[in-house]
């Protein structure tokens, strides 16, 4: 496969293609060694990070030395069966990850501010507490 990749070096790749792959639907007990065994068949792997927290379990990042090896691995391993689980292999998109992280950070900050200043809940009760409640006309 490496020979086929070398022949395609002059080919232009789509913008979403990069050296970092994001893998989903992994078996929870998969090891880094098993990941190197699977993904190493398509080229030199620089790094593999397997998720181990509740949010990241079943996912991993694989970083290839060469972008063409990453492209080949993505094409061949999407849908690959590992322990009766079909892998979802995508190109890592940093902008999506940052947007998600920024949103979560902003939500947490907003909740902290609401808690600190006692904001939130029923608006009429808040007005009544502050003496801003006016009786309705009949």
Swiss-Prot record:
SMART domains, A to Z: RRM (SM00360)
Span list, region Interaction with pre-mRNA branch site: 16-29
The keyword Ribonucleoprotein belongs to this UniProt entry's keyword annotation: no
Residue intervals of the RRM domain: 19-94
PROSITE patterns per record: RRM
Pfam family, one: RRM_1
UniProt keyword annotations, A-Z: mRNA processing, mRNA splicing, Nucleus, RNA-binding
First-listed, main subcellular location of the protein, grouped into a coarse class: nucleus
Subcellular location: Nucleus
One GO BP annotation of this record: RNA splicing
Highest rank taxon of the organism: Eukaryota
Its biological purpose: Necessary for the splicing of pre-mRNA.
Protein name listed in UniProt: Splicing factor 3B subunit 6-like protein
Provenance organism: Caenorhabditis elegans
């Amino acid at each position: 496969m490496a020979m086929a990749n070398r022949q395609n070096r002059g080919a232009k790749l789509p913008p979403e293609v990069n050296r970092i792959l994001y893998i989903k639907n992994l078996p929870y007990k998969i090891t880094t060694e098993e990941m190197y065994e699977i993904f190493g068949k398509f080229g030199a792997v620089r790094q593999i990070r397997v998720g181990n927290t509740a949010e990241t379990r079943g996912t991993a990042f694989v970083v290839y030395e060469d972008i063409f090896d990453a492209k080949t691995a993505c094409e061949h391993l999407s849908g690959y069966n590992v322990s009766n689980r079909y892998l979802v292999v995508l190109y890592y998109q940093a902008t999506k990850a940052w947007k998600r992280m920024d949103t979560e950070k902003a939500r947490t900050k907003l909740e902290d501010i609401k808690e600190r200043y006692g904001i939130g809940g029923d608006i009429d009760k808040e007005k009544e507490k502050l003496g801003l409640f006016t009786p309705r006309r009949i």
